[in-house]
């Protein structure tokens, strides 16, 4: 046996020696190549036998590419080893890596804004600001705004090779400091900031540094890999290619053989088409995102990655930059302490080894994470309280009289020691000697401390610019060539089109259906060419086809607006210039225009009976295709100009209206007033319709004479509409349309280049964190009566249909299981922590228990105090603080809480008690000073993330629930705010309530404030359910008893230790299955017995029930919803103010264009013009109301889903509130329009006629508005709503009776005429104004007789039209309510 072993060993060693010899020979051959070729050539071990192959990394075959990516993926498995090897390689040849030292001196930052009540965006304030702007422009008054100081005269140095932790309470100026240091601040900054002695003007800071925002702004439809890969393609490799070339040159000179693993990685990451993919895979691996790399990012309405993964994605997207300085803002929100430690440690390894510079702001760093940092910057009230080595920070605070207690995290101590409320507990002396030490005094003391003196001394000596490495600071504006940036944007645009392919397919099918509808209405068997009047029918068909193309493009505005936040972020960070974004969004959409035009023209042209000449067929196609491009470009320009969904949805219909009025169909060129004739000549629709008309009516089929007229019939038809009748005008019109395509796309690009988001409004009280006053209410419990309840659950399984991405990877199971046999109990008076690594299923379990899942498959039993859970009852006695803080943006903190309390507290609670209770809860979570602060939109305006989190908790607490689920209540909070929240939660539990919290990164103090722990591992399995114990003794005892688990270190955070020792990596290393160990433990059996005990109803008890489905009566629900909607509308100027401005402009436009036409009776064309005015106003203002209400509905609908899940109100009461609040605004809009138009157009001034006009316009605007609301309720998103709405706008347009009167509509479609609301509007408007007019036209026919004979309108049936328009308004409002009740498009 020994001989055999020796022979085998010798054989293996001989084989190994041969492989080494072969590798040496290949390396020797490689070394002989020129440096340029060697940079592109590497030795790659090919699977499965590891055969070495010489490959060109720039031109890889598919199999080589896969092998390369597999090989370099292994590099990320040990990031520190890789970095050390790389550093060793560059050190061997004497290459010095670039470093950056950042200095800031006498730095001041301030903002300018309206504050207090003037800061609230009410309609009145908006009009006041507009008037002030006008008076300021005329130098009559001065701008009344306040300067809000953020940072005061701060100075410091951030050195390379060192990790700097930025601490400070919210509102202290952390984000402003990071933005200023990164060179991306939009506020007023004074003082000096230098990189290696160079001012910001001497280099490109956006490419020399990377700012990682605390807000996760991504395109929801892209996957994680695609998001990071796009960033990598745009950022490029920086100086790394030059480094590689120099490295290879020196190694060749010194005859040094590089490490093969490092060599192939560097070459793959800096050259070839796969370089972005290599960097992307590496970053995803080290940040733990490789497990969700092919999952879409998602958003509130589209299921995607978790909040913690989204936060890591934000980090990944930015650290692909080759910049040497990192400024990272709250990157740990939503991450567990173990994951945070790993990420920060990975960054630390990079910074330490490669000489980078990093400033990272963290909210609740665990002690072990805190110790990874070298330096500390502590901000408070806009001043630097400490800036220096971590080792001296406790020494400094001890010198001013404060000491950090044992088992207290130093980071938590630092954030609390400057707070007026928390400072006293850290005072070294006796309570009698304590006096509050203001932040200014501490900051002054730091200047005298030896660390502060050393910084001042160093700042006094300028940095020697000669020491600056040439590659340290970027001087080129963009990372790669314009060609590469354009390719990256084109590829991304194609991806987005694929992900939204359903939308485009749906739109094409819809267009096909409308085309079938149109061609069967204008069918050739009913279309004649024997009179000018019949020629008008053909003109109407051309006009309708043109407007169909125009309206179909409206749906593009929603998706375009949704992408703007990502564009502005990436543009400002110099990912790419705006034109590389705008050009693909134009070019890639050309096939969509081609498809839409093809569907329309190919279906309708010959069926309607246009000129059969095939050349004229393709000419019509060309006009409509180019017009489609014009309208898409116009709407993109509007989106970029307004940058707001509501304003854009108003501007779109407004532009359509102007161009439609001036196109020559509704009002002929001869009838256009001389002061508006310029509008006729600049209207793109005029050129489109003129080209269509010339193409059709100059055809051979129209070249015939009719009795009583001279010249061909086609020219007579053109002349009757005042169109330009020469053939040349077809090509002139095509040229004009192409010019508009270019113009609007250029304007779109200019807007994207120079415009930014509107400045947010700052509330004075919300701005100051330390405005929160000390309150003794922090120790109070809630006083309202409630029923203590427990919840048990057994063998819970939750699964979803297997995603396509998993199937593509070979997963054959039909369902993906996210929770596996989960059992437990949550009891009254017991505070339970639900913990686990990111992706363990914590939020999923809470969603299942709370009944919030809208998809998937749930198995198992859930009982409430022994009785089976009934969701209707459970929603009444439970509260759920969701991870995403979803609130109505246009109400204040106090109003949000009052609304929740009003609808969720029992009807027996009177208003005074309810108000007192709300104030008590505000004091409990310390948001009383913020009661008048506007909530706002996350990341845009209003409350900061930590205040929003406290509001989320308060909204549930005011419901006085018996059971409360809290999903990451301390996520996004600093240590002090987290302590406030935990005190409030602890007080809540002490009143006898059942509270469960998922929690990340708890400090020792917060973790040990919980009574029990429910611990889950990745894969949705429980591994510990039981008591934590005093100083976590029970938890530690359980895990230390497991073989292979390392003992906890003294002073180590038990929660962090627990997550580390139970991680998947540790399970694999120790071969331990913690889930199986738990299920075989005595603790598991004890829990099973407890579940069994609690699952049986107590003797003499009864199942909880309520006499009504909701806490409040229907009328109260409606009043509460109406009250909140009133506040939301009053504070939504983009919606209301723009609507009224639009109405005024439209009224003046109509009044001046149709001036005095209501008094004329000369001929029938005059009546057609009057009806055209009515038709245009009805369609334009109606579509504007319908399209502008939809974004407002979608913003509130997400909040509605949360509130409905809590059983606050019925869908019908909410819908009625939404409908009712529109009536006063629509009525005022109607008054404005009717008074102006009625007077200027010259309708007959009688009370009855004016009231009829008012009546029909009011209900027309009402049913259009309610139709828009109904469509928002029936569709999953704004884009789909716009697409579906557009179809009905066009159908209503067709059957309105204007393009083709009822008597000319084919009999098989005439039934729909009676179902068209616009037809009844035109009937009512025309009949009420002219149905009793007996004046005669030039041909002797009276006005009333012509109306009855041509249109079929009868004066004595006016009341039918009135009933019809009222009925449509009621119908659409009812369907809106029904849609909210029946459909839930939120995917959870």
From Swiss-Prot:
Annotated region (Disordered), positions in chain: 1-24
Molecular function terms from GO: ABC-type transporter activity; ATP binding; ATP hydrolysis activity
Annotated disulfide bonds: none
One GO CC term on file: membrane
Pfam families attached to this UniProt entry: ABC2_membrane (PF01061), ABC2_membrane_7 (PF19055), ABC_tran (PF00005), ABC_trans_N (PF14510), PDR_assoc (PF08370)
Major localization listed first in the record, in broad terms: membrane
Binding site for ATP 2: 836-843
Keyword list, A-Z: ATP-binding, Membrane, Nucleotide-binding, Repeat, Transmembrane, Transmembrane helix, Transport
Stretches that traverse the bilayer: 503-523, 541-561, 590-610, 621-641, 646-666, 675-695, 732-752, 1136-1156, 1167-1183, 1223-1243, 1250-1270, 1280-1300, 1305-1325, 1357-1377
Similarity remark: Belongs to the ABC transporter superfamily. ABCG family. PDR (TC 3.A.1.205) subfamily.
UniProt-recorded name of the protein: ABC transporter G family member 52
Organism lineage string: Eukaryota, Viridiplantae, Streptophyta, Embryophyta, Tracheophyta
